[in-house]
């Protein structure tokens, strides 16, 4: 059987402007993206009446987890900078809407509110100026 696998090349991560009719700007030079890591919390509801002594659980709340990604860090770029971009949002503790656009998956778009919780530059002598970023999802994501 032939594979139906798709390349993830061309996926975009976008940052919302917070406007009423929100506009999303593509975050410049995003490299690898990992996440979102969705999870369901559970509660153990095992009782003395549980069948054959097996643990019983119920689902409680859902969590959006986080999204981590690498960028070719461009400090003056509006989506990266300390005056208007990701670094400013982290320092200001600003919750923003983000979009993860996966064109290879029939244009799947995840939209989610998140906080920038990590911004770690890497400045190698023999290498490109990069940064690792982590977003913590702070509400319900939507899929379209």
Protein language model regions, located:
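Short, cysteine-centered beta-strand-loop-beta hairpins and adjacent loop/turn segments enriched
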Residues: 75-78, 141-144
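Solvent-exposed edge beta-strands and adjacent loop segments
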Residues: 2-73, 113-128, 134
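Short, loop-centered acidic/histidine patches that primarily coordinate divalent metals
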Residues: 72-74, 103, 138
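Short solvent-exposed strand/turn elements
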Residues: 129-143
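Short, low-complexity, polar/charged sequence segments that are solvent-exposed and flexible
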Residues: 87-94, 117-121, 133-136
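Absolute protein N-terminus
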Residues: 1-2, 144
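Short, structured coil/loop segments at alpha-helix boundaries
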Residues: 52, 76-81
């Amino acid at each position: 059987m032939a594979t139906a696998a798709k390349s993830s090349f061309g996926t975009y991560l976008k940052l919302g402007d917070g406007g009423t009719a929100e506009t999303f700007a593509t975050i410049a030079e995003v490299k690898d993206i990992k996440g979102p890591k969705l999870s369901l919390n559970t509660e153990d509801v095992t009782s003395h009446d549980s069948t054959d002594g097996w643990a019983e659980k119920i689902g409680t709340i859902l969590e959006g987890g986080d999204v981590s990604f690498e960028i070719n860090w461009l400090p003056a770029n509006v989506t990266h900078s300390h005056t208007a971009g990701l670094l400013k949002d982290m320092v200001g503790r600003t919750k923003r809407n983000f979009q993860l656009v996966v064109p290879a998956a029939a244009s799947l778009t995840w939209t989610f509110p998140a906080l920038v919780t990590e911004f770690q530059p890497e400045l190698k002598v023999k290498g490109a100026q990069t940064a690792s970023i982590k977003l913590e999802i702070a509400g319900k994501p939507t899929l379209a």
